């Protein structure tokens, strides 16, 4: 137990400034609980959205593409910005612990996560860094017009078989986000793939509907 206490105290001392509770709510529920609701895709490509992102210092435009934006998910001012709900899409790394006793008192540490969105006439393309996760660790689904992304992985990093008893050190990472789909998104055609620690999500767009104008005779 002495080793357990030492492991816990070191982790809490190093990460207390970033500590944050781990929530078990679903991505959609977390987004719904937010007063601003889920992220709206349209805000990513509006001038107002760009100004808001620049104000917070959390967004840097991607190079070479006028319809793409790269966002560093770091909330510095607590003000609303285009990727407001991606503050919830942050990996939560549980403090390394020994056995279930430590897992019950472990706090969470956050680390920055970057995301990028690109848009063309046929699709939206989203890219998120999810280091340590494979395709079996990520779930992507659409719930009532909200694109939900949830990922979690837990690894045993060290086993302790000393005189204090059996136990193990472990680490976990959790990712989640809720994104409100635009009206032209085709939910049935959404695809997702994890490659080299990066989640790629493609959202096809429906063809632009032609506007119908009918003249009304005024009498």
From Swiss-Prot:
Its main location: mitochondrion. Gene3D superfamilies: 2.60.40.790. It is found in: Mitochondrion. Pfam families: HSP20. GO terms for cellular component: mitochondrion. Residues 1-29 form a transit peptide. Keywords: Mitochondrion, Stress response, Transit peptide. Induction: By heat shock. Residues 104-219 form the sHSP domain. CDD domains: ACD_sHsps-like (cd06464). One of its GO terms (biological process) is response to heat. Belongs to the small heat shock protein (HSP20) family. May form oligomeric structures. This is 23.6 kDa heat shock protein, mitochondrial. It comes from Oryza sativa subsp. japonica.
């Amino acid at each position: 137990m002495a080793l357990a206490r030492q492991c816990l105290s070191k982790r809490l001392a190093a990460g207390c400034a970033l500590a944050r509770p781990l929530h078990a709510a679903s991505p959609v529920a977390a987004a719904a609980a937010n007063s601003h609701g889920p992220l709206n895709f349209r805000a990513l490509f509006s001038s107002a959205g760009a100004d808001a992102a620049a104000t917070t210092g959390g967004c840097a435009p991607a190079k070479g593409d006028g319809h793409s934006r790269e966002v560093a998910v770091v909330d510095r001012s607590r003000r609303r910005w285009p990727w407001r709900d991606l503050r919830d899409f942050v990996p939560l790394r549980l403090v390394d612990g020994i056995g279930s006793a430590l897992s019950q008192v472990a706090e969470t540490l956050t680390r920055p996560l970057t995301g990028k969105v690109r848009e063309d006439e046929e699709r939206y393309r989203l890219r998120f860094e999810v280091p340590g996760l494979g395709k079996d660790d990520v779930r992507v689904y659409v719930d009532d017009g909200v694109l939900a992304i949830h990922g979690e992985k837990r690894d045993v990093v060290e086993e302790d078989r000393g005189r204090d008893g059996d136990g193990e050190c472990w680490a976990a990472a959790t990712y989640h986000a809720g994104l409100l789909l635009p009206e032209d998104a085709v939910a049935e055609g959404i695809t997702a793939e994890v490659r080299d620690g990066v989640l790629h999500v493609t959202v096809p767009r429906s063809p632009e509907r032609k506007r119908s104008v009918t003249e009304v005779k005024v009498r």
